Amino acid sequence: MMVIRPVERSDVSALMQLASKTGGGLTSLPANEATLSVRIERAIKTWQGELPKSEQGYVFVLEDSETGTVAGICAIEVAVGLNDPWYNYRVGTLVHASKELNVYNALPTLFLSNDHTGSSELCTLFLDPKWRKEGNGYLLSKSRFMFMAAFRDKFNDKVVAEMRGVIDEHGYSPFWQSLGKRFFSMDFSRADFLCGTGQKAFIAELMPKHPIYTYFLSQEAQDVIGQVHPQTAPARAVLEKEGFRYRNYIDIFDGGPTLECDIDRVRAIRKSRLVEVAEGQPAQGDFPACLVANENYHHFRVVLVRTDPATERLILTAAQLDVLKCHAGDRVRLVRLCAEEKTA
């Protein structure tokens, strides 16, 4: 049975294996054991209540409960940009006009922005390609909404998610090649690694401070503004079905889109509800896949089951209860996947 749980110190080697499979561009999952160990420690201290809000971040893993195999990772940053500036480009417009010459030009322009400072962030979503089946991607991505719904007071009113932009298998980013490299004088992979290992001072030191006309970029770079990496397209679709939208903010490195949504308008958060759980044999039928989560902050668990999403009393097997760390009579959080999201 696949289950979402909080990260543990012993997961570092499994996370290293996942990091080696990302293909680059996933800044928050570098193949660097020391950095990953620090990230795990920060998550543990967040759960223990030892960090200020500006440093808090939760990390979860997707595990096969029978074998202990870690198949994926996802995370939530509680409030971005309160220690180090959190940069985007806002894709806007500058107008240059002359009535005398009868010239009017509306030019797409990139403006350096810190507009999402303080927002909660969905990040570090990666599922091992071997496990991209049977609804595991939905479970991994949406489990964070179950945690946010259960512990709403831990998070801010806006949630953002940076989507990985267009990068090829060799680490070539058209957007970086045309823009970032001119200011940072390094390859994309080097900048990505420095950022992922916490060495972010160079961003503030070398970033272009003035608006940039996109027409000055190569056509290849212009074409990937706001576009996602092919492997990231499913993750974008999942978030958009939950209510997230692209509001013309992009990543400063690869030009990938930043999606955003008010936390209380996220479908899974808004529609999830608490029901009593009982032990027994679940009813058979053509029921939809639903997320089921306990309400245990320190031992949070989420699984995917097929059940009636309108039930007032959820029947689970002894094995399911055990994985969820629940007992008969406990209350669990329940919400169905979107109607079009299939797990077969």
From Swiss-Prot:
It catalyses: succinyl-CoA + L-arginine = N(2)-succinyl-L-arginine + CoA + H(+). The active site is at 229 (proton donor). GO terms for molecular function: arginine N-succinyltransferase activity. Pfam families: AstA. InterPro entries: Acyl_CoA_acyltransferase, Arg_succinylTrfase_AstA/AruG, Arginine_N-succinylTrfase. Pathway: Amino-acid degradation; L-arginine degradation via AST pathway; L-glutamate and succinate from L-arginine: step 1/5. It comes from the Bacteria. Keywords: Acyltransferase, Arginine metabolism, Transferase. GO terms for biological process: arginine catabolic process to glutamate; arginine catabolic process to succinate. Succinyl-CoA binds at residue 125. Its EC number is 2.3.1.109. The keyword Transferase applies. Belongs to the arginine N-succinyltransferase family. Catalyzes the transfer of succinyl-CoA to arginine to produce N(2)-succinylarginine. This is Arginine N-succinyltransferase. It comes from Escherichia coli O1:K1 / APEC.
